[in-house]
Amino acid sequence: MAESGKEKIKWTTTIIISSSLKSYEVATALENRSHKVRYSDSVENGSIIFSLSGVAFLLMDTKECLLSTEEIFLAKIEKFINIHQNSFLVLSAALHGPEEWKLMFRIQQRFLGCNLRILPVHNTVNAINLMCTIAKTTSKPYIDSICYRMITAKAYIIEQSPVWKTLQKIKLNSDSVNPN
């Protein structure tokens, strides 16, 4: 299948999933995408780790967070971010109403300045798409390509920018007046 002159290559990677998620839809969905899924009892319950990309996701249901004590789920999140440098909290709710947004705000306040990013999702498909997109864009061949394209775009913008050209003319004119 060709797409704009290039063949589209299916991205697959190895994913370490907490054994607590083995019977959940999210694990099945990742397996169905042809990823190499490994289950582990040694990772935090509810975690999904894309080891080649260096990203980790902690899946939590907002209802469960709201029903449990704040100290319990905050301790779980803290343990997770202390282990994983590039961490995401995936908060799932069918509808993100006022209570769910208050919960996210409390978590953001508690972990302000930490390496935790919060992803509100509505369903499994939404969660899988977000996790795979983040993992794919942070994996080695893709991140190199993205960096190259950003550098190229920056160079093009600088080269074609009328503001940049005006600044260069001003600098050239000031250099001819000022002999230093």
Curated annotation (Swiss-Prot):
Mind telling me which GO cellular component terms the entry cites?
chromosome
Keywords, ordered alphabetically: Chromosome, Meiosis
The subcellular localization recorded is:
Chromosome
Q: Which gene encodes it?
A: SPO16
* Protein name, per record: Protein SPO16 homolog
How the protein assembles, per its UniProt entry?
Answer: Homooligomer. Interacts with SHOC, SYCP1 and SYCE3.
Which domain of life does the protein's organism represent? Eukaryota
Q: What's the stated role of this polypeptide?
A: Plays a key role in reinforcing the integrity of the central element of the synaptonemal complex (SC) thereby stabilizing SC, ensuring progression of meiotic prophase I in male and female germ cells. Promotes homologous recombination and crossing-over in meiotic prophase I via its association with SHOC1. Required for the localization of TEX11 and MSH4 to recombination intermediates.
